[in-house]
Amino acid sequence: MLKYCAEIWDEVRNRRPLVHCITNYVTVNDVANIILAAGASPAMVEYPAEASGFAPLASVLYFNLGTLTGEQEAAMLEGRWAAASRDVPLILDPVACGVIGRKVDLIERIKSLGKIQVLKGNIAEIKSLAGLAGKAQGVDSLDTGEGLEEACLQLAVKDKLIAVATGEVDIVAEENRYARIFNGTPLFQNITGAGCMAGGVIAACVGAAPEEAWLASITGLLAFNLAGERAASQAGNRPGTFRTLLFDELFVLRGEELMKEGRLEW
């Protein structure tokens, strides 16, 4: 599997997919820059009238519900509707959906307009959408992760999508299969927006290989986590330094290194 992940990672730079992002204002700059570091091209188009015209031109859509405004909500609905006829894949991060019911309603409305290819969240968010009890404090998960594989598979089957759960060990599931990703670093917990950035890198990979969305999702998360590991080894216990190095390490990461250093189980 690592061989295929390496090929997809290098393909991102070859294809330079256009990633249409509607994301939260806390992390929008970091998301744009991490997508650039991955080798893709970000476009932060949020005005509804513009989103409906732009979304069909994109390689992939990335919607993040972190600081959801009425204008963003309208843009997501317009964009998903307009892009559905072109089969543009959608990656959705349902930030805090377990504690803000309005976001669950929006997810259902988006699903009614077009398929969600990948749904990426923390443990509490994934369990909540799978119909299980998850513990959350605001946007952060307090869940231990017990039963996470089953929750991801349940959500993947229920909504016919790829479920990505981030935690101490990350899970990427579709229908009757899943992979565990063991790369990563605790320093991700000390910066704002690690999950948002991970979603952006996943979107870049799915945009480059939409026909292999499960492998592309694994590739994006694996690359982001490995870049984090490498950054942490140089940063010590300094989150500001770590954040800067994260962009640098992702930018220089190549498929051959991903194949050698990636730690997967499937």
UniProtKB/Swiss-Prot annotation:
ATP binds at K120, T166. Substrate binds at M44, G193. InterPro entries: Hyethyz_kinase (IPR000417), Ribokinase-like (IPR029056). One of its GO terms (molecular function) is magnesium ion binding. The keyword Magnesium applies. The keyword Nucleus does not apply. Pathway: Cofactor biosynthesis; thiamine diphosphate biosynthesis; 4-methyl-5-(2-phosphoethyl)-thiazole from 5-(2-hydroxyethyl)-4-methylthiazole: step 1/1. Pfam families: HK. It catalyses: 5-(2-hydroxyethyl)-4-methylthiazole + ATP = 4-methyl-5-(2-phosphooxyethyl)-thiazole + ADP + H(+). GO terms for biological process: thiamine biosynthetic process; thiamine diphosphate biosynthetic process. It is an enzyme of class 2 (transferase). Keywords: ATP-binding, Kinase, Magnesium, Metal-binding, Nucleotide-binding, Thiamine biosynthesis, Transferase. Its cofactor is Mg(2+). Its EC number is 2.7.1.50. Belongs to the Thz kinase family. Catalyzes the phosphorylation of the hydroxyl group of 4-methyl-5-beta-hydroxyethylthiazole (THZ). This is Hydroxyethylthiazole kinase. The lineage of its organism: Bacteria, Bacillati, Bacillota, Clostridia, Eubacteriales. The gene is thiM.
